[in-house]
């Protein structure tokens, strides 16, 4: 059983004005001037004499790159021309991938995002056991006005959000004032429906809870936009969900730029995994995995890896190389780790995986304890790997000799070796696995699950995530 009283198998099986927006990637910064705009498809007069415009958003999808979603009313009217305020509430059992992706993408877009706890303390344990630290308690948000309020799902997180009276009032006011609001996964059915906020709204949600949605208005799409409301299906559609909201707030140019940084591309439809010198990774015991992290690590990567592996019944330890259990990840997400690296080093691990993030990678490289752990992992023939810029950590420690790898495509990265595999999102060479990171990290994590347990386990986990697993 997991720490929330749910077994991992249960979790896995849950089947517009000119403005400046500063886009930040983990590998550097890009500043650009953006003119947010939506293409108007038609104008329909309402009974109140106002106009309603149908708008079309075109976003590439991990499950259907040609997907088109339609806005059926005016949306995205913010509180100011330069700053968009966003609220992301979290509670005990919130789906951490969904929460962290929302925060990450919207902050990259330039939004002022507040993470608020509906519990009595700031520290909140997610549905897969990752502990997040909110910025404020929800009571601090009661009198604030937000351009967007977006609810992550997860169980029992969606129930905890539903039972918060302050949040209910905030959401109802948001809908009444016709400002943007959204929900993903279980949240549409479990949270918004009891509040009466799905009335006459086309809605989607997690397949396991789809039957709870109003039949006539429920649709099986990854993203559904109906007026001010945007809904989505699960962790595997989190990036689409967040990008859709970013586009509604900041415009298509901003959303497309972030999409490129995050590596959301056609590889989702045509997987680009490469394996060389294949060996058996299966074990006769529960796999033990160490994920070392630091200030500046990519929150999306570390949270996604831990979440996916825990769904697959892997024993995961997230360890800080800092002096504190608390780290501040890239884009400001605050995470409470399981152990300090010194304590973690007292045990041995079947896999050690380094998440990326430029600053985080530099701090991981400086850890003498981690360097020793990695050398022991290499010398014993056990598995290790990295995502994003952290492949350079392995390279500088001499752990990628004669190994084929991949790394985040950045001009600032020095060539690691002559065996870089161009175009590959995940590369496995014997007992070493590397990935481009960011939006490809779910594929990376599922590749690990497949190597440890086989395709059937990986496919089962993928279904719970609402992420398309490639046919074998």
Curated annotation (Swiss-Prot):
Where expressed (tissues)? Expressed in young leaves.
Tell me the superkingdom of the source: Eukaryota
For biological process, the GO terms are: chloroplast organization
User: Where is the protein found, in the record's own terms?
Assistant: Plastid, Chloroplast
Q: Where is the PfpI endopeptidase domain?
A: 84-250, 287-453
Which Pfam families does the protein's record reference? DJ-1_PfpI
Quote the disruption phenotype from the UniProt entry.
Albino phenotype and seedling lethal when homozygous. The phenotype is due to the absence of thylakoid membranes and granal stacks in plastids.
Is this entry keyworded Cell membrane?
no
Q: Which UniProt keywords apply?
A: Chloroplast, Plastid, Repeat, Transit peptide
Can you supply one Gene Ontology CC term for this chain's record?
chloroplast
Alphabetized InterPro entries for the sequence: Class_I_gatase-like, DJ-1, DJ-1/PfpI, Prot/Nucl_acid_deglycase
**Which residues are the transit peptide here?**
1-60
Q: Which family does it belong to?
A: Belongs to the peptidase C56 family.
Q: What does this protein do?
A: Plays an essential role in chloroplast development and is required for chloroplast integrity and viability.
Output the PANTHER family linked to this UniProt entry.
Answer: PROTEIN DJ-1 HOMOLOG C, PROTEIN/NUCLEIC ACID DEGLYCASE DJ-1-RELATED
Q: What else is known?
A: DJ1C lacks the catalytic cysteine residues in the endopeptidase domains which is a highly conserved feature of the family. However these residues are not essential for the function of DJ1C in chloroplast development.
Q: What is this protein called?
A: Protein DJ-1 homolog C
As recorded in Swiss-Prot or TrEMBL, the protein's gene is named: DJ1C
């Amino acid at each position: 059983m997991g720490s929330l009283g749910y077994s991992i198998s249960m979790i896995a099986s849950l089947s517009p004005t000119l403005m400046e927006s500063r886009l930040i990637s983990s590998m550097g910064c890009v500043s650009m001037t953006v003119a947010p705009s939506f293409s108007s498809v038609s104008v329909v007069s309402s009974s109140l004499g106002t106009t309603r415009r149908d708008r079309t958003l075109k976003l590439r999808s991990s499950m259907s790159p040609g997907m088109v979603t339609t806005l059926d009313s005016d949306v995205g009217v913010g509180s100011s021309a330069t700053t968009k305020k966003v609220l992301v509430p979290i509670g005990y059992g919130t789906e951490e991938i969904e929460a962290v992706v929302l925060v990450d993408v919207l902050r990259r877009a330039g939004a002022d995002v507040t993470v608020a706890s509906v519990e009595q303390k700031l520290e909140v344990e997610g549905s897969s056991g990752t502990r997040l630290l909110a910025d404020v308690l929800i009571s601090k948000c009661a009198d604030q006005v937000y351009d967007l309020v977006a609810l992550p799902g997860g169980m029992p997180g969606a129930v905890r959000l539903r039972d918060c009276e302050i949040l209910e009032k905030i959401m109802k006011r948001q809908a009444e004032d016709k400002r943007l609001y959204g929900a993903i996964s279980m949240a549409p059915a479990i949270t918004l429906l009891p509040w009466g906020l799905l009335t006459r709204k086309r809605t989607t949600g997690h397949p396991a809870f789809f039957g709870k949605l109003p039949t006539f208005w429920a649709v099986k799409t990854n993203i559904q936009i109906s007026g001010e409301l945007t809904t989505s299906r699960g962790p595997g559609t989190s990036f689409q969900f967040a990008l859709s909201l970013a586009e509604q707030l900041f415009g298509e140019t901003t959303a497309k730029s972030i999409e490129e940084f995050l590596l959301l591309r056609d590889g989702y439809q045509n997987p680009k995994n490469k394996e060389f010198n294949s060996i058996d990774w299966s074990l006769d015991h529960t796999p033990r995995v160490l994920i070392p992290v630091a200030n500046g690590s990519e929150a999306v990567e570390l949270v996604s890896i831990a979440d996916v592996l825990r769904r697959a019944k892997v024993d995961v330890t997230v360890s800080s190389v800092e002096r504190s259990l608390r780290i501040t990840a890239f884009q400001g997400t605050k995470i409470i780790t399981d152990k300090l690296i010194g304590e973690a080093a007292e045990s041995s691990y079947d896999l050690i995986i380094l998440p990326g993030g430029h600053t985080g990678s530099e701090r991981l490289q400086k850890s003498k304890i981690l360097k020793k752990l990695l050398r022991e992992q290499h010398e014993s023939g056990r598995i290790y790997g990295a995502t994003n810029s952290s492949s350079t950590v392995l390279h500088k420690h001499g752990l990628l000799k004669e190994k084929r790898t991949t790394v985040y495509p950045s001009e600032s990265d020095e060539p690691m070796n002559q065996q870089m595999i161009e175009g590959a999102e995940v590369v496995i060479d014997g007992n070493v696995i590397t990935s481009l990171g960011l939006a490809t990290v779910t594929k990376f994590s599922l590749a690990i699950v497949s190597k440890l347990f086989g395709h059937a386990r990986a496919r089962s986990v993928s279904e719970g995530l609402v992420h398309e697993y490639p046919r074998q």
